[in-house]
Design a protein with these regions (language model features):
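Short, Lys/Arg-enriched N-terminal segments with co-localized hydrophobic residues
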Residues: 1-12
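Short histidine/acidic/glycine/proline-rich micro-motifs that form metal-
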Residues: 143, 170-173
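Conserved beta-strand/loop subsegment of P-loop NTPase cores
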Residues: 46, 130-138, 158-169, 188-207
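Nucleotide-state-sensitive switch-loop elements of NTP-binding domains
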Residues: 14-20, 25, 29-147
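A short, aliphatic-rich alpha-helical micro-motif
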Residues: 97, 155-158
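A short alpha->loop->secondary-structure connector
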Residues: 123-129, 154-156, 181, 185-190
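Charged helix-capping and loop-helix junction motifs
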Residues: 149-153
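C-terminal accessory "lid"/substrate-recognition subdomains
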Residues: 8-9, 54, 172-225
Length: 225
């Protein structure tokens, strides 16, 4: 199919949500909840596993979501960064003809959010897609001895997020929540980002306890630039 045919076939801009978080933060479990809510609202969604590894275990964990209103796609890893970016762009172009209302992207645990926005503003993706929500998951018991590179990535993941969620918050005391929040703000300061968070701005809840108001908050949280 030619690109001009794809462009004609896309009637409305498709929103893309990016779900970020380090390995173990609970991205896959959260996506199952989030995607299930979207499907209950009658949305047709595509989930794209943008994995830099050679084997994608998360894809297996999400398989029970597949059906008429949900499809799973994957970008295979095992290549260099430039090759992976090309595959990412090609996959999104192909997905534009699938009639999705929304696409959810789960990148690997190491991902620069700027690359997400850079890709969406390139042609021809800017004709098909627009940024939806950027949701950042942070382990409430986050270790406070991250490497300089990991701390930078942590800051980039939350800096543009429309909503930050603390995962496993029911497993740690409030003192630890405050310590994680402080570490998060330190990471932002070190990359010269002016944004800071207070605890009441963080969605701190077990995924099982998310209610209608929480889902609406997530669905409309957007992103910050």
């Amino acid at each position: 199919m030619y690109l001009k045919d794809i462009i004609r076939g896309v009637k409305d801009m498709i929103k893309i949500d990016l779900i970020t978080g380090f390995l173990g933060a609970g991205k896959t479990t959260f996506i199952k909840k989030y995607a299930s809510y979207l499907m209950k609202q009658g949305r047709k969604i595509g989930i794209l596993e943008n994995d830099f590894g050679a084997v994608n275990v998360d894809m297996l964990l999400l398989q029970d979501l597949e059906g008429d209103n949900c499809s799973l796609e994957m970008i295979a890893g095992g290549c260099d960064a430039d090759c992976h970016r090309r595959r990412f762009k090609t996959k999104l172009i192909a997905m534009a003809m699938s009639g999705y209302d929304r696409v959810i992207i789960e990148p690997s645990g190491i991902y620069d959010v700027d690359e997400f926005f850079d890709a969406l503003y390139e042609e021809p993706l800017d004709r098909f897609y627009e940024p939806g929500n950027v949701i950042a998951l942070v382990d409430a018991g986050l270790e406070e001895d991250l490497s300089k590179e990991a701390k930078y990535l942590l800051a980039t993941e939350v800096a543009d997020a429309g909503c930050v969620l603390f995962s496993k918050c029911d497993e740690v005391p409030e003192k630890q929540l405050k310590a994680t929040l402080s570490y998060l703000n330190q990471a932002l300061e070190q990359v010269h980002c002016k944004r800071r968070f207070t605890l009441d701005q963080i969605l701190c809840k077990s995924w099982e306890d998310l209610d209608e108001a929480d889902h609406k908050r997530l669905l409309t949280c957007g992103y910050r630039m």
